[in-house]
From Swiss-Prot:
FAD binds at residues 26, 45, 53, 58, 98, 133, 298, 339. It is an enzyme of class 1 (oxidoreductase). This is Ferredoxin--NADP reductase 1. The lineage of its organism: Bacteria, Pseudomonadati, Chlorobiota, Chlorobiia, Chlorobiales. It comes from Chloroherpeton thalassium (strain ATCC 35110 / GB-78). Binds 1 FAD per subunit.
Length: 347
């Protein structure tokens, strides 16, 4: 994804209407909403590129549950979202982490970054996903860390790493099942290992996995775990599985544990907003306990929350719309429609 350099800033003294903390799908769509409501914004993200987890961890993963896209890659979705946002020319600050947010006497906010920069805005929207995150690793493989990124992978940056390999996938959630299905067309053989009796993934994907098992394309071991591995020099050769009945050794040249992430809100906990678990408590307008600070996407906590890309986009729309009441008090907030914008341009 290319971002026109005119939008990228290292430091800017201009006061924006909204500072968006986080450049994942929720943050990018928040910029779209800002543009539609005729307010300007700045996106700040600690990563070197936009996209959050989608581009940092799973750029080639295919997504099937976003409305309007029967199938789209993670990187492709971010590309499309950015094409929407770019028309409004949001300022983008990459490679710098927000470490503090202070509310000023006039109700505006000063945002401080790790590199010593300060940014000012009239409202703040936190769309930081899981906060700081790292993949959960298998503790029994601590003596094989030298094989990580060559034979043992905890994320998939390129599916080519698994081409014509004997792959063992560990996990039972959506990521594990999605990648298992995707690898069937790439790897020499795929084995799926899950420590529980049932999978915790979408029913359709689970059905696809069992169908692949019936045709011999996939081996499935439930109530099982990878006890250890065997390696020849710097290459994985076998995985040792502990099953309900016995311990077995199978050929494996790639190991892909996909067992979730460890998340940490980090400095966000010290910003004076109410925290709930590993998220930020918000009301039905996506506003936090500090007036003028909003949260959207996976980091936002409210009753009935679903952690999906499309709900994150909805969160962003609600947050931006309500922020207008704070940014422009007394002005009537009008509902904006994309079709209305198109007709305005034609006129």
């Amino acid at each position: 994804m290319s971002i026109n350099q005119q939008y990228v800033s290292g430091k800017s003294t201009e006061v924006r209407d909204v500072t968006i903390i986080g450049g994942g799908p929720t943050g990018i769509f928040a910029a779209v909403q800002c543009g539609m409501h005729h307010i300007n914004c700045r996106i700040i993200d600690s990563m070197p590129s936009l996209g959050g987890q989608l581009t940092a961890l799973y750029p080639e993963k295919h997504i099937y549950d976003v409305a309007g896209f029967p199938e789209v890659s993670a990187a492709g979705l971010i590309e499309q979202l950015w094409s929407q946002a770019a028309r409004y020319k949001p300022e983008v600050v990459l490679g710098d982490k927000v470490v503090d947010v202070k509310k000023l006497d006039d109700g505006s906010f000063e945002v401080f970054t790790e590199k010593g920069h300060s940014y000012f805005s009239r409202a703040v929207l936190i769309a930081a996903g899981l906060g700081a995150f790292s993949p959960r690793k298998l503790p029994q493989l601590k003596d094989f860390e030298h094989l990580e990124e060559t034979s043992i992978f905890y994320t998939v940056s390129s599916i080519d790493h698994f081409k014509d390999e004997k792959v063992v996938v560990v996990g039972g959630g959506d990521s594990a099942l999605d990648w298992t299905i995707a690898l069937l067309n790439v790897a020499e053989h795929v084995t799926l290992v899950h420590r529980m009796k049932e999978f915790q993934a979408h029913g359709k994907t689970v059905a696809d996995a069992y169908e692949a098992q019936e045709t011999g394309k996939l081996d499935i071991y439930l109530e099982s775990e990878v006890a250890s591995v065997l390696a020849d020099s710097d290459r994985l050769t076998h995985a040792i599985l502990k099953t309900p009945d016995e311990e077995i050794t199978i050929e494996a040249t790639r190991l892909l544990p996909l067992i979730g992430f460890r998340s940490n809100l980090g400095p966000i906990k010290n910003w004076g907003i109410e925290i709930s678990g590993n998220g930020i408590l918000v009301d039905n307008h996506m506003q936090t306990t500090v007036e003028g600070i909003y949260a959207a996407g996976d980091i936002a906590v409210y009753e009935g929350k679903l952690k999906l890309i499309q709900t994150g986009l909805s969160d962003a729309a609600m947050a931006v719309r309500h922020s207008l009441r704070y940014i422009k008090p007394g002005e009537k907030v009008k509902q904006q429609f994309s079709s209305q914008k198109a007709s305005e341009k034609k006129a």
